[in-house]
């Protein structure tokens, strides 16, 4: 069986646009008739996904897999680091948690993970025509190069040609690219097949003199100037920007609490795309105002974030709003916080054994343990005003919650899930708005409460919208890149598969 060709996208910094460029290449190669898989040896992210077989992986490679038209597979991201504090992360290998590690401890052991990385990569390479590899941060972080397993270190392991991308939108792109190339070793520079200027706004002719000088100084071709593409695609590099965004004023106001360790806030992208729903993230009591719905999202550290809510006054503000009738929704860690008590007897969640009082809005008790619950599932909401809404989603949580009240939904296997009391709703299901049914029922409920007519506010199904956006991304990137040069860098010509 022949082994796949590969191309690797590295960047001059975090946020250079590697994730979306890889998604675009996945889509382009798939459009050209190739079997494609994305790959990132090590990802650091708060937003994760659970595969069909119950393995946890980074969402960036999930998006790239969707762009390629294939099912997400944990082999696409064998190592995932989920920060739980400023100095430590949960280390997930091949979809399963290995435990919490400090940065220093992880750096000392990470080279021992090379066999896991190569096994995952080689397995994918045996099943596909092209592997699109994403780097992390910058390959020129000279303090990290000795034990690199995600940039040039990985490129050497799998013999990958490299495209180096720089972000012109933040300025200094020529210095970014030239400086990065100069800091690389000779054998590393030899792997670079082309430079990409990413996120350009304006007339590309203005860049021509700079491009010529860059090529002269680096002895590398510029294989594309990619415009700033306004596509609505979940992008790891821009997720933090989403938290800062001030959405256009819309008839309905949804306030999501921006917890210090917020995770999987990708759950709420479908709400942002609804014409009637204005979504904003709030950190302070004075920002909360009088929203039509308050959401407590998932978190990587429920206990610490509950303390933060309490100490900063947001807990009291949410309780006042709830008492006045404002609906409140909690997802995963947010659901746990809404209960009466949270117990961490072994300190698995918070580092030290403790028990905290919850917000007391739901009749539940959560006990944290060592075993993480990872599963994909389908469900049907059983409670008004959302009864009948069909959901698909996934669960990622270590806590077990005892419910002394009505369930939010019934899972496909008949198990009750979540909890409801009055206008307070809690669920462990991530991705609950992706099908659109719950979004529509939620919108109708909020419109009725506010006396708004929802007629005419049609929502494109999420999957249809996602595919449209992937095609827009691929069209824009294909037009900007020298695709024959990229195929040549892989030792291919377009059409080799026919």
Feature roles, as predicted:
Residues 1-322, 327, 344-347, 370-371, ...:
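Flexible phosphate-sensing "switch/lid" loops adjacent to ATP/NTP-binding sites
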Residues 332:
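Catalytic nucleophile serine of serine hydrolases
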Residues 339, 343-347, 351:
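Extracellular/periplasmic helix-exit of transmembrane alpha-helices
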Residues 348-375, 381:
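Conserved P-loop NTPase catalytic core
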């Amino acid at each position: 069986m022949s082994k796949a060709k590969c191309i690797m996208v590295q960047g001059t910094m975090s946020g250079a646009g590697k994730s979306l460029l890889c998604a675009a290449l996945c889509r382009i190669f798939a459009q050209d008739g190739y079997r494609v898989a994305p790959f990132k040896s090590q990802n650091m992210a708060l937003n994760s996904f659970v595969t069909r077989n119950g393995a946890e992986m980074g969402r960036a490679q999930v998006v790239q897999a969707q762009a390629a038209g294939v099912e997400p597979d944990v082999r696409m991201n064998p190592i995932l680091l989920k920060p739980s504090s400023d100095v430590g992360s949960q280390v997930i290998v091949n979809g399963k948690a290995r435990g919490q590690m400090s940065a220093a401890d992880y750096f000392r052991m990470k080279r021992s993970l090379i066999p896991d990385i190569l096994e995952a990569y080689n397995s994918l390479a045996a099943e596909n025509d092209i592997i699109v590899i994403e780097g992390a941060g910058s390959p020129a972080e000279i303090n990290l190069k000795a034990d690199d397993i995600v940039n040039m270190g990985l490129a050497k392991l799998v013999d990958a040609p490299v495209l180096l991308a720089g972000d012109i939108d933040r300025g200094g792109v020529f210095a970014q690219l030239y400086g990065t190339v100069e800091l690389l070793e000779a054998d590393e520079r030899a792997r670079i097949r082309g430079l990409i200027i990413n996120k350009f706004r304006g007339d590309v002719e203005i860049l021509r003199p700079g491009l010529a000088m860059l090529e002269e100084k680096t002895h590398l071709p510029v294989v594309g100037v990619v415009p700033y593409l306004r596509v609505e695609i979940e992008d790891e590099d821009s997720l933090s920007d989403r938290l800062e965004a001030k959405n256009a004023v819309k008839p309905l106001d949804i306030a999501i609490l921006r917890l210090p360790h917020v995770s999987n806030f990708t759950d709420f992208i479908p709400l942002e795309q609804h014409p009637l729903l204005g979504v904003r993230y709030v950190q302070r009591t004075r920002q909360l105002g009088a929203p039509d719905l308050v959401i407590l999202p998932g978190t990587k550290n429920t206990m610490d974030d509950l303390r933060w809510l309490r100490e900063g006054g947001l807990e009291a503000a949410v309780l006042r709003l709830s008492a006045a009738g404002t609906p409140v929704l909690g997802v995963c860690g947010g659901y746990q916080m809404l209960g009466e008590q949270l117990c961490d007897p072994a300190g698995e969640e918070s580092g030290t054994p403790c028990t905290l009082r919850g917000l007391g809005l739901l009749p539940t008790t959560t006990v944290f343990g060592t075993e993480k619950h990872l599963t994909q599932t389908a469900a049907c909401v059983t409670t008004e005003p959302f009864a009948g809404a069909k959901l698909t989603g996934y669960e990622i949580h270590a806590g077990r919650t005892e419910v002394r009240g009505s369930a939010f939904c019934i899972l496909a296997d008949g198990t009750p899930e979540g909890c409801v009391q009055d206008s307070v709703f809690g669920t462990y299901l991530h991705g609950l708005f992706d099908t659109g049914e719950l979004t529509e029922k939620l919108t109708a409920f909020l419109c009725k409460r506010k006396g708004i007519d929802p007629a005419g506010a049609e929502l494109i199904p999420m999957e249809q919208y996602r595919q449209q956006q992937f095609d827009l991304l691929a069209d824009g990137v294909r037009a900007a890149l020298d695709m024959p040069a990229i195929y040549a860098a892989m030792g291919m010509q377009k059409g080799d598969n026919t």
